[in-house]
């Protein structure tokens, strides 16, 4: 991937037909991209929510309530999701060092290995899809997607997502 900065185009004025069309196209592309990500995840035995949990835990241990909030799911849903990951040996529960009544979830070595395989499979899928655009655009598309991930993390840190 190139280290060259991505040149931002001046976006069309908000509320114009052109901006509305681009936003609709982007929203639909995001939905299609989510589907394209689930294909390689299935090949490594993960669902999209499981992948997201493993990726979150790769950043550090987390309590079920924190994971539920980050995934925007209910506590019962996160409990079921975590039970499956614990059963598979990808995640382990540990007592919270600050509050013995709470548990924290930790990514195991098998979980880290599975996450690495999933990252690689998804990355390969993105590269394969990117070959269907003009030469050089694939690298820019992947870099732009990575930057969008940075924007999501920044918005989450600012409390706006």
Question: Across the structure, where does each feature detected by a protein language model lie?
Answer:
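Exposed, interaction-prone assembly regions rather than primary DNA-binding/catalytic cores
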Residues: 137-161
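N-terminal leader segment of winged-helix/HTH proteins
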Residues: 1-45, 107, 136, 152, ...
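Short amphipathic alpha-helical segments with heptad-repeat character
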Residues: 20-27, 31, 72, 112, ...
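Hydrophobic alpha-helical membrane segments, chiefly transmembrane helices and signal peptide h-regions
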Residues: 31, 78-81
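Charged, amphipathic alpha-helical coiled-coil/dimerization segments
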Residues: 83-146
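Generic structural concept
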Residues: 27, 58-61, 108, 142-149
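DNA-binding alpha-helical recognition surfaces that contact promoter or target DNA
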Residues: 55, 80, 143
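N-terminal helix-turn-helix DNA-binding core of bacterial DNA-binding proteins
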Residues: 35-77
């Amino acid at each position: 991937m190139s280290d060259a900065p991505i040149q931002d185009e001046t976006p069309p004025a908000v509320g114009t037909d052109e901006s509305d069309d681009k936003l609709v196209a982007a929203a639909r592309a995001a939905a299609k991209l989510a589907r394209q990500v689930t294909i390689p995840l299935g090949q490594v035995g993960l669902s999209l929510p499981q992948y997201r949990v493993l990726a979150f835990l790769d950043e550090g241990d987390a309590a079920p309530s924190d994971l539920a909030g980050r995934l925007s799911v209910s506590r019962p849903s996160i409990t079921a999701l975590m039970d499956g990951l614990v059963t598979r040996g990808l995640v382990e529960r540990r007592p919270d060092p600050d509050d013995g009544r709470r548990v924290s979830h930790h990514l195991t070595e098998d979980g880290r290995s599975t996450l690495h395989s999933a990252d690689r499979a998804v990355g390969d899928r993105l590269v394969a899809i990117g070959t269907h655009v003009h030469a050089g655009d694939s690298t820019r598309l992947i870099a732009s997607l990575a930057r969008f991930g940075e924007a999501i993390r920044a918005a989450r840190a600012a409390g706006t997502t």
